[in-house]
Design a protein with these regions (language model features):
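Heptad-repeat coiled-coil amphipathic alpha-helices that mediate oligomerization/assembly
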Residues: 4-11, 15, 519, 526, ...
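Hydrophobic alpha-helical transmembrane bundles of multi-pass membrane proteins
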Residues: 1-423, 428-450
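Long, low-complexity or tandemly repetitive, helically biased scaffold regions used
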Residues: 479, 486, 504-510, 542
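Signal-transducing coiled-coil linker
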Residues: 452, 459, 466, 473, ...
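Intrinsically disordered, low-complexity terminal
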Residues: 399, 521, 549, 556-565
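HAMP signal relay modules and closely related sensory coiled-coil linkers
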Residues: 389, 407-421, 431-448, 456, ...
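Signal-transmission coiled-coil "S-helix"-like helices
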Residues: 447-450, 454, 531, 538
């Protein structure tokens, strides 16, 4: 066959491959902007490396498992052909551009595999170790993506049922979301993402403008993602219009919902709404009308909002919203293909009723979720057996730019210095590391604050010692006063009893001896004085009790001072 007439279609396929590859830059920008600055380099590097690893794995074996004839009667997996070594087994029979130029088709499909892998990096960001993610991305390109791809696109059992996923709402996006969900569950949430009561806490993005730029890159790349999934022809323009239209209405759907629920246009949800609309239309861009693409886009955006709220309720920490965008919107896209597919196409091409076709679409989405989550969970667990999956608390606090890659940035140095100083592992002078950089004013302010806190701790320790000494002195005085009071009470009581006996004797002799009457008056006066002295002793006891209470308060104050020290 003379390939010359197909060169324009080949050119479009290669351009589309470049556009899909450019989406990698969009994902890099979205994910780097969504995470905190201290983890941005790690996330960016993962996006670069997962392209390398998944591309290599897809080349080595994955492509053949996906597109070669089924190795079993059911259609579960293709025949292994390492390194594209035998193209005669890779569905090269046909007349369209995909089969005439098999290497160009491989290139296009490899970029799709890259997309499925890179979806995962965002969802598990800020806690998954770099090496663990590299191994996971290899597993995706080698087995997980090719197997479901064979079911749906390689002549497998789903394709035989009549399943339709035009450009990958399930094959790429829902699959990536399922693997992400498994990773999120296995890894757990980031520190501080949920409070002690389970309520979600917002972890701010480092750069929403970068996220917005990434979304625009992705929308631009989606022109090739969907437009290149069919041979160049009259339908290409309609496919591209449906694609961008759904992205626009995805954002509109989110804005309407968010304004109704919050009264504030949330930046991250609106941007994810664009992506949700794009994901949803990807399954059906070639078989639905333009008005239907508007509805699908609206539903895709709404799915992002619903999915985000459900993840918060379930306490699942998806750092960038990958599961709502690619998972929830992916399901919407697959099911809506059955609901909105062109009736003529459905009757002539699929030869099914709408109910039958929609049932097949639902079966396909369930199969995708089950395969992606099940195989993904197993992959995460297997990788965890060989290497550590998650960074430690101190590494998470300082950030993965430094803990994983030792990137010495001023902010990273400052953060590390503050963490070490707070933990008592370094002197506050370590902040001088950044004294000459752009963060020098902030570093000096933090250094001064740490030094003031150190001085306050020393002063608190001194006050605790002083209060302890005062407390000891008061305790001694209290004991001495109590002893003296008891001795005085005993002596005064004895004296009072003796005087009372003398009074009784004088009372009997008063009539016989005039002098006794005078002495009796003196005795009565002395009795009154002794009674007054005895009556005053309880007031001394109460005073000593107040001293004891004051001593207790001094104990509390000294303990508080020791705590501040």
């Amino acid at each position: 066959m003379d390939p010359t007439p197909h060169y324009p279609a080949l050119a479009w396929l290669l351009i589309s491959s470049g556009l899909v590859f450019f989406m990698q830059a969009g994902f890099l920008a979205v994910e780097s902007g969504m995470v905190r600055y201290k983890n941005s380099i790690n996330v960016a590097l993962k996006n670069v490396v997962d392209f390398c690893t998944s591309f290599a794995a897809f080349l080595v074996l994955g492509y053949s498992l996906m597109f070669s004839p089924s190795a079993d009667p059911i259609g579960l997996i293709g025949m292994p052909v390492p390194f594209l070594s035998d193209l005669s087994l890779l569905n090269t029979a046909g007349t369209d551009v995909f089969t005439i130029f098999p290497f160009a088709f491989f290139l296009f499909q490899a970029t799709f595999c890259n997309t499925a892998a890179t979806i995962v990096s965002g969802g598990v960001a800020e806690r998954c170790r770099f090496m663990a993610y590299v191994l996971v991305s290899i597993g995706i390109g080698l087995v997980i993506y090719p197997v479901f791809g064979h079911w749906a696109w390689g002549g497998g059992w789903l394709a035989r049922l009549g399943y339709h996923d035009f450009a990958g709402s399930s094959v790429v996006h829902l699959l990536g979301a399922g693997i992400t969900l498994a990773g999120v569950i296995v890894l757990g949430s980031r520190a501080g993402r949920f409070g002690p009561d389970g309520k979600p806490r917002t972890i701010p993005a480092s750069s929403m403008p970068l996220v917005a730029l990434g979304v625009m890159f992705l929308a631009f790349g989606w022109i090739g993602f969907n437009g290149g999934s069919a041979p160049l022809g009259a339908q290409t323009a309609t496919i591209v219009i449906n694609t961008l239209n759904a992205g626009a209405f995805g954002a509109i759907g989110v804005m309407m919902l968010v304004w109704a629920l919050r009264g504030v246009p949330s930046a991250d949800l609106i941007l994810n709404g664009v992506l949700g609309g794009l994901v949803a239309i990807t399954a059906s861009a070639n078989v639905v009308s333009i008005p239907a693409s508007c509805v699908i886009g609206l539903l895709g955006g709404a799915a992002v909002v619903v999915g985000t709220r459900l993840l918060d309720r379930w306490r699942l920490d998806d750092a960038v919203g990958a599961i709502p965008v690619h998972g929830f919107a992916g399901v919407v896209g697959v099911v809506c293909t059955g609901l909105f597919a062109d009736a003529t196409w459905l009757a002539e091409t699929k030869q099914m009723t709408r109910a039958h076709f929609t049932t097949v679409q639902i079966i396909g989405s369930i199969a995708c979720i089950a395969w992606a989550f099940g195989s993904g969970w197993l992959l995460w667990k297997l990788v965890g057996k060989g290497t550590s999956l998650r960074i430690g608390p101190d590494e998470e606090a300082v950030g993965m730019n430094y803990s994983e890659h030792k990137v010495e940035e001023p902010l990273q140095q400052l953060t590390q210095a503050v963490v070490d100083s707070a933990n008592g592992r370094r002197d506050a002078q370590v902040l001088d590391l950044v004294r000459d950089g752009e963060l020098a004013p902030l570093a000096r302010s933090i250094q001064a604050l740490i030094r003031r806190q150190a001085e306050q701790r020393r002063e608190s320790a001194n006050w605790a010692v002083t209060l302890g000494e005062v407390r000891s002195m008061l305790t001694q005085e209290q004991h001495a006063g109590g002893t003296a009071a008891r001795e005085s009470r005993s002596e005064l009581t004895d004296a009072r009893e003796a005087i009372a006996d003398v009074g009784k004797l004088l009372e009997r002799r008063r009539l016989e001896d005039p002098t006794a009457a005078v002495l009796l008056d003196l005795v009565r006066m002395l009795e009154r004085r002794l009674d007054a002295a005895l009556a005053a002793l309880p007031r001394i006891d109460r005073s000593l009790e107040r001293v004891a209470a004051g001593t207790g308060r001094l104990d509390d104050l000294a303990a508080a001072m020791r705590g501040r020290a």
